[in-house]
Amino acid sequence: SIPLPSLNFEQFGNMIQCTI
């Protein structure tokens, strides 16, 4: 479960926050 390289920490974090 490794996120894409340099995907966009802000967008990635937002996605995780949305899941929680």
UniProtKB/Swiss-Prot annotation:
Keywords: Disulfide bond, Neurotoxin, Presynaptic neurotoxin, Secreted, Toxin. Its main location: secreted. The keyword Secreted applies. GO terms for molecular function: toxin activity. Transmembrane segments: none annotated. Glycosylated. Expressed by the venom gland. The keyword Translocase does not apply. One of its GO terms (cellular component) is extracellular region. It is found in: Secreted. Preincubation of P-elapitoxin-Aa1a with monovalent antivenom or suramin prevents or delays toxicity, respectively. Antivenom fails to reverse neurotoxicity when applied at point of 90% neuromuscular blockade. Treatment of P-elapitoxin-Aa1a with 4-bromophenacyl bromide drastically reduces enzymatic activity and toxicity, presumably by alkylating a His residue at the active site. Belongs to the phospholipase A2 family. Group I subfamily. Heterotrimer of alpha, beta and gamma chains, each related to PLA2. Heterotrimer: Snake venom phospholipase A2 (PLA2) that has presynaptic neurotoxicity. Inhibits nerve-evoked twitch contractions but not responses to cholinergic agonists acetylcholine and carbachol and to depolarizing agonist KCl. Causes a fade in tetanic contractions. Displays a triphasic mode of action with depression, enhancement and blockade of neurotransmission. Does not display myotoxic activity such as changes in baseline muscle tension or inhibition of directly stimulated muscle twitches. All subunits are necessary for maximum toxicity. This is Phospholipase A2 homolog P-elapitoxin-Aa1a gamma chain. It comes from Acanthophis antarcticus.
